[in-house]
């Protein structure tokens, strides 16, 4: 490829393979009785040319990565607002939620707890986060966190109390009492 000339046919080119026949002239009709304002005509004829043109509003259903979202695009904020304040938009949102619920196996998306706020969530069950018998350990940084699981290296179970300070300041791990 040299410059913008391809050495082969571009399979994604929008140019037609053969010229299209010229459209037949449309018969003239009487002017319609509806009157549109100039701004409405401009807005209706104006297409958002690129994803960064205009304004968009994204509606994420429950905040999880797998949840659906609906993106409404318009020429300006008033255009987007006009689109979302319609019965059709509400019907669309209801339908999207119904379809998402069907594929998720539930009746609809459950609301997210707390919205996450960028905090790391633990995927361990509650029992794995609490030491047996409610045992707690402390270091110079405060209460330590109980961790248990299966070692990826050895495949053996482990249980320990870990310091919550930044990694470069952490105290040594402590092992729970064997009972």
Curated annotation (Swiss-Prot):
Residues 104-119 have a biased composition (Gly residues). Residues 29-38, 120-132 have a biased composition (Low complexity). Residues 18-28 have a biased composition (Pro residues). Residues 1-38, 102-137 are annotated as: Disordered. This is Gene 49 protein.
């Amino acid at each position: 490829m040299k410059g913008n000339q391809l050495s082969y046919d571009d399979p994604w080119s929008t140019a037609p393979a053969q010229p299209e026949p010229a459209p037949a002239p449309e018969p003239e009709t009487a002017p319609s009785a509806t009157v549109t304002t100039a701004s409405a005509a401009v807005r209706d004829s104006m297409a958002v040319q690129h994803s960064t043109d205009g304004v968009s509003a994204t509606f994420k259903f429950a905040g999880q990565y797998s949840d659906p979202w609906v993106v409404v695009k318009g020429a300006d904020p008033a255009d987007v607002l006009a689109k979302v304040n319609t019965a059709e938009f509400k019907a669309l949102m209801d339908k999207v939620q119904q379809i998402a619920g069907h594929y998720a196996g539930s009746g609809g998306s459950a609301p997210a707890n707390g919205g996450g706020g960028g905090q790391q969530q633990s995927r361990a069950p509650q029992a794995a986060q609490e030491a047996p018998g409610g045992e707690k350990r402390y270091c110079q940084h405060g209460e330590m966190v109980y961790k248990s699981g299966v070692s990826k290296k050895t495949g053996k179970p482990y249980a320990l109390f870990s310091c919550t300070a930044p990694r470069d300041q952490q105290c040594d791990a402590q092992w729970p009492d064997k009972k």
